[in-house]
């Protein structure tokens, strides 16, 4: 929730990045380069590149993946990554419809299995449509009359209700993130959160949902650090603070996350490391299968 997020900002536990995008607008396409060394400029098939899960395992981390999305034929790509984890859990409808079940399942079934070093993925449903199904009724805080639609192509009552449901799903998502952050507040822990893609909510035209547009690519990206992590790793916290306003594309995540936690490989490129002084802030962010230069449409 915004109040919770504001408190975290004020206590310097939560760092919110201002200029992050995905290179595509669909989960499966984003996953082709989110957790491995493939990116928008590489030429080999994405599955030829080393992936983050295997690298963490080789670095003696216990790996966990908690999955809330139903995997169908459109989710084969992320399924291939999740299956690399040593411990894979599907927390689907039989556990409850909402993302809060991930935190509950973790507390009950995973926490006791942690080792000295752990890499844990929580894959939320988030704000995928249908948006009204993404939050409990108790989180239906906003009504259409509460929102400003003047900059949107939402003209009908139906369109405005869709936008309102989406806003409520974000309100609920903030609460879920707060629950996940709290799971690690007493650990030496750093938590990365980002969306695989965004939703274009009547922003570029009279439609909503997946769209390879400016609005459909702009994603939230934030990092939570526990007090213990801050105390033990002040130099890493400083690197995070210094990167908050740099232009970033999520296909470079592996080049940034691994070095920050002390893992280095022969495939890393320092100019792609968001937290390095040598980060290339002039990189052209070519998106949507090479069809668009994002920064030229800003």
Pin down the residues of each PLM region.
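Active-site-proximal alpha/beta segments of enzymes that process anionic O-linked groups
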Residues: 1-148, 218, 249-250, 255-276, ...
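Solvent-exposed coil/turn segments that connect beta secondary-structure elements
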Residues: 39, 125-127, 197-198, 226-228
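Catalytic lobes of large eukaryotic enzymes
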Residues: 219-227
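Active-site-proximal cap/lid insertion segments
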Residues: 72-75, 125-179, 207-220
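Soluble non-cytosolic domains of exported or imported proteins
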Residues: 43-47, 96-100, 157-160, 164-174, ...
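Short beta-strand segments
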Residues: 65-67, 119-126, 167-170, 190-195, ...
């Amino acid at each position: 929730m915004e109040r919770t997020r504001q408190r975290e900002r004020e206590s310097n536990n939560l760092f919110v990045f201002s200029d992050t995008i995905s290179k595509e607008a669909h989960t499966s396409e984003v996953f082709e380069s989110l957790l491995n060394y493939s990116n928008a400029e590489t030429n080999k098939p994405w599955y030829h590149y080393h992936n983050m899960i295997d690298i963490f395992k080789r670095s003696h981390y216990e790996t966990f993946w908690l999955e809330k999305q139903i995997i169908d034929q459109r989710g084969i790509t992320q399924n291939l990554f999740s299956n690399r984890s040593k411990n894979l859990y599907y927390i689907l409808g039989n556990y409850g419809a909402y993302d809060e079940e991930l935190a509950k399942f973790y507390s009950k079934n995973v926490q006791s299995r942690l080792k000295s070093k752990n890499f844990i993925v929580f894959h939320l449903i988030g704000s995928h449509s249908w948006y009204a199904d993404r939050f409990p009724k108790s989180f239906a805080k906003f009504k259409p009359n509460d929102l400003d639609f003047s900059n949107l192509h939402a003209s009908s009552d139906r369109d405005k209700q869709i936008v309102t449901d989406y806003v409520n799903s974000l309100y609920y998502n903030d609460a879920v993130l707060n629950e996940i952050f709290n799971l690690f507040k007493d650990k030496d822990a750093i938590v990365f959160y980002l969306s695989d893609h965004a939703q274009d909510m009547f922003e570029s035209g009279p439609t909503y949902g997946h769209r390879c547009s400016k609005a459909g690519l702009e994603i939230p990206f934030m990092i939570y650090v526990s007090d213990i992590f801050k105390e033990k790793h002040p130099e890493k916290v400083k690197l995070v603070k210094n990167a908050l306003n740099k232009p970033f594309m999520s296909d470079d995540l592996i080049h940034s996350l691994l070095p920050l936690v002390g893992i280095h490989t022969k495939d890393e490129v320092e100019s792609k490391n968001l937290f390095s002084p040598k980060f290339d802030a002039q990189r052209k962010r070519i998106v949507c299968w090479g069809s668009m230069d994002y920064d030229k449409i800003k």
